[in-house]
Amino acid sequence: MSKIRVLSVDDSALMRQIMTEIINSHSDMEMVATAPDPLVARDLIKKFNPDVLTLDVEMPRMDGLDFLEKLMRLRPMPVVMVSSLTGKGSEVTLRALELGAIDFVTKPQLGIREGMLAYSEMIAEKVRTAARARIAAHKPMAAPTTLKAGPLLSSEKLIAIGASTGGTEAIRHVLQPLPLSSPAVIITQHMPPGFTRSFAERLNKLCQISVKEAEDGERVLPGHAYIAPGDKHMELARSGANYQIKIHDGPPVNRHRPSVDVLFHSVAKHAGRNAVGVILTGMGNDGAAGMLAMYQAGAWTIAQNEASCVVFGMPREAINMGGVSEVVDLSQVSQQMLAKISAGQAIRI
């Protein structure tokens, strides 16, 4: 089997050296070239035709985002961004994902060499996922039409969403059309600390419903979406007649924290047939067992179809496990969620 050919673009010679060491330490991939800036990278891409590009977000000669935008328009290819953990870094990284980057890795704040080498397996996994991802020429997503507002739903109803690679844009596409009368939405997206808050703030500006990073103990309200904080598990809990959010530091599940399975199992337990579950694009199997539990508890469950996924891993696993009520294109997910939950949704026999 041929190796995954990687090209790394970073203005730091140390980072280029470390990325080369990491990539070449895995037998199924090789670093074919490195570039100190996007202008040099442009020529190297033509020369080496890499399978995956790793791209530093912040560079002096040409902004990484400008380069990414041109690249995705003219020569779409899988890109993994390398970002700092600063607030600005998280905003720029989210913009990169919007422009078509597949995923990102964060640079450690101290001890770059030791930190990056400790991330070696994670970086290799992201490169492998990117090499398999579905890439299309970047077309800015049209602002979705707001769905017709139905009657304000009971606070018993709620929607639970899980996603990983490719999920930030898929979640945006699902949340933007939701009217203020929507039920509560609780979301687990695999993402490190610092990025989930920026992600929630960005969505809050784009959506009619309120979007925020979830906090432990807060009440779950209709017309609001709650995003699991990075490196914490989020569960649905009960407080009398109300739902509330529980945030905790439990061990990783399916190697993830936050884990979609943790969220979905809690929704199955506390919301049952009053919930709709949605599993979107992502690598691996996180969420499949939890979605089956939701399905068995009477919830309507939706998986994103392969054609609209960046990576079809998580939806495929959920479908194979038998816990999916229907498989729909990303463009139809919002509509189906609301249709099922408004109809009292527990219409499965």
Swiss-Prot record:
Activity control note: Phosphorylation of the N-terminal regulatory domain activates the methylesterase activity.
Chief location bin: cytoplasm
Superkingdom of source: Bacteria
Description of the deletion phenotype: Cells lacking this gene display a strong clockwise motor bias; in combination with a yhjH disruption cells switch to a counterclockwise bias.
Record-listed E.C. numbers: 3.1.1.61, 3.5.1.44
GO MF assignments: phosphorelay response regulator activity; protein-glutamate methylesterase activity; protein-glutamine glutaminase activity
UniProt-annotated location(s): Cytoplasm
Modification(s) after translation: Phosphorylated by CheA. Phosphorylation of the N-terminal regulatory domain activates the methylesterase activity.
Domain-related comment: Contains a C-terminal catalytic domain, and an N-terminal region which modulates catalytic activity. The N-terminal domain is not essential for catalysis.
Protein name listed in UniProt: Protein-glutamate methylesterase/protein-glutamine glutaminase
Protein species of origin: Salmonella typhimurium (strain LT2 / SGSC1412 / ATCC 700720)
Biological classification of the source: Bacteria, Pseudomonadati, Pseudomonadota, Gammaproteobacteria, Enterobacterales
Gene behind this protein: cheB
